[in-house]
Amino acid sequence: MQQQLDAYCAHLRSERQVSPHTLQAYRRDLEKVLGFCEKMQVRSWTDLDIQGLRSLIARLHQQGQSSRSLARLLSAVRGLYHYLNREGLCTHDPANGLAPPKGERRLPKTLDTDRTLQLLDGAVEDDFLAHRDQAILELFYSCGLRLSELTSLNLDQLDLADGLVQVHGKGSKTRVLPVGKKARSALEQWLPLRALSNPPDGALFVSQKGRRLGPRAIQLRVKAAGERELGQNLHPHMLRHSFASHLLESSQDLRAVQELLGHSDIKTTQIYTHLDFQHLAAVYDSAHPRAKRNKGGE
């Protein structure tokens, strides 16, 4: 068994040309399987069956191995058996149909409402960068936008009169979102300054030279605001998570939050229900802590 394992690793190195890091990880995983086989007196790769491999996976899971690590181990086993089958040394694959135990999904990091208001209610200096960055922060939180969605926004997608923004999301799906009062005010402060930079295209958020801000530039501005106002690391998706969590906590309307976020599967939205946690515009108007829009169409 050791010879065949060594031959497979040599095949990965010379023919598949996998990286040293990947090769080391695969060998380490397969050595675990080999050690298990020796303890269970499984004397050849042909004798390892699905029940035996399932027993190993269960044992490793109980010892604290993550689902991700176990998935990699199963991938290594499948690769080994694909090689053994191709070489005529085996006729089955014990990993076929096996999946690692499901791990707990990591919960999104959010700001609570007080911390969010602390971030957004800080004093704004009267200059180009300050007004632009404030508009970016307010729009992220007001609409729960993805970084890619905000980066790609053009001026003609914004309707301040009606308080709406058209967003092009994942899968070429378009959704129209309400823009809260605070975000509208910040945008109204920003747009005259934007015009002074003479942007050559319709980008909503631009540099002082009129060029569209890229994702990295926006990430850095959000990070700087987090460090300045909150003394913590902040990234755009944390504002999206906070938007979703705060709305869901107040409204308990999972479907509305799903549509506002642009999630195709409600299971993706359900991750926010951990925060203890009317349609769309009504939920937005009544629940969002910074989006109370005046009646009568301000």
UniProtKB/Swiss-Prot annotation:
Keyword DNA-binding among record annotations: yes
GO biological process, one term: DNA transposition
Identification of the protein by name: Tyrosine recombinase XerC
Subcellular location: Cytoplasm
Catalytic machinery residues: 146, 170, 237, 240, 263, 272
Family from the record: Belongs to the 'phage' integrase family. XerC subfamily.
Subunit structure: Forms a cyclic heterotetrameric complex composed of two molecules of XerC and two molecules of XerD.
